[in-house]
Amino acid sequence: MITLAVDCMGGDHGPRVTLAACRQFLEHHPQARLLLVGQPESLGGFAHERAQIVPASEVVSMDDPVEVALRRKKDSSMRVAVQQVKDGAAQVAVSAGNTGALMAIARYLLKTLDGIDRPAIATQMPNARGGATTVLDLGANVDCSAEHLLQFAVMGAALVSALHEGTEEPAVGLLNIGEEVIKGNEVIKRTGELLRSAAESGDLNFYGNVEGNDIFKGTVDIVVCDGFVGNVALKASEGVASMIVGALKQEFKRSIFTKIAAVVAYPVLSALMRRMDHRRYNGAALLGLRGLVFKSHGSADILAFEQALIRAYDTARNNLLDRVRSRVAHAAPLLGPAAAQPSP
C-alpha cells in the first residue's frame, strides 16, 4: 500500500478540484491510500475507507512570499503534507500550491540527499514518438553551475528509470544552441565535459548536446538545463499546444464544409488533442530531497490533478528515492563537494 499526503487546499481551485481528483484516483488505484490535508470544515464531505483527513488550520496562498509560508504559516496544509513524508506517515506528498513555498518547505523539512547541492524540478513533455521527454530543471534554480547540471542529469536518469520500467539507461541530452561541442556558454561547455566523463565511467548514457526542438522529437529521454531556460521552454510549449488546438477548433467551425470535415476527421483530431493535452503530463517531481514531493500546476483541473497523483504514486511504487540515492552514490566521484561529505 502506497500512502500519498495531499495538500487539498493548494492551487487556484482548492478542495473543489483536489477532492474530486482524489476520489477518482482512489477508484482507479486500489493499492493507494490518501492523507487529505487541510481545513476540516472544507474536507468534511469526503469519506472513503482508504482516505483519512489530517487537519491543518492555515493555507499558503499563491501570492504568499516564501518567508511567510516557511516561518509564519507553520500549520499550513502544504507544510503538514510534507511533514507526513518526513514522519514516515506517507511515501510522497502532492501539492498544487505556491512553487517557491513548496520547494522551501520541502527543502527545510526533508533536507537534500548526500551528493546533491540543490533540488531540481522535473516533469515530462509529449514528444513525436508517442512518449514523453523528461526535462529538468523547470524553475527551482535560475543560476546553475556545471556541477549542478550534472547532478540534475543523474537525478533525471533515476526518475525516468522509475517511471518507465525497462529503461535503466535513459539517454541524456544537454540543452544548447547547437549540437556542436564548441557551442554554448562556459557553463554549458563545462557541463558537456562533465557529462562526457560520466558517460566514459559508465554513470550516464550521455547523447550529447540537443536543441529545443529535440525535446519534442523525442531524440533523448532526458533534457538537462537550468531553471530559467527550462521554465521558459515549458510555458512556451504549453502555449503553442493551446494555440494549435484553438486554431483547429476555429478553422473547423468556419463553414458547413469544414464542419463536415471535422466530423469525418473527429477520431484523428480527438487522438491528436489527447496527445497534446498538457493536463495529461501534469505532475513535476522535486528531485534531490530525502523524501518524495510532487508539484501540480496551480491551475490544474480534476483531470490534471489526478495525473499528478498518478505520477507521484508510480514513482513511489517504483522506489524513485532509492534509485536516486543509488545513482548519486555511484556517481559520487564526479559530483563535486556535495558528494564528498554527508549532509548534516
Swiss-Prot record:
GO molecular function, one term: phosphate:acyl-[acyl carrier protein] acyltransferase activity
BP terms from Gene Ontology: fatty acid biosynthetic process; phospholipid biosynthetic process
Pathway in which this enzyme or protein is active: Lipid metabolism; phospholipid metabolism
UniProt keyword Transferase, yes or no: yes
Origin superkingdom: Bacteria
Subcellular location: Cytoplasm
UniProt EC number: 2.3.1.274
Pfam families: FA_synthesis
Tagged with keyword Lipid biosynthesis: yes
One GO CC annotation: cytoplasm
Main location: cytoplasm
Keywords, comma-separated and alphabetical: Cytoplasm, Lipid biosynthesis, Lipid metabolism, Phospholipid biosynthesis, Phospholipid metabolism, Transferase
HAMAP family cross-referenced by the UniProt entry: PlsX
Subunit structure: Homodimer. Probably interacts with PlsY.
Function: Catalyzes the reversible formation of acyl-phosphate (acyl-PO(4)) from acyl-[acyl-carrier-protein] (acyl-ACP). This enzyme utilizes acyl-ACP as fatty acyl donor, but not acyl-CoA.
Protein family: Belongs to the PlsX family.
Record's protein name: Phosphate acyltransferase
Organism in which the protein naturally occurs: Paracidovorax citrulli (strain AAC00-1) (Acidovorax citrulli)
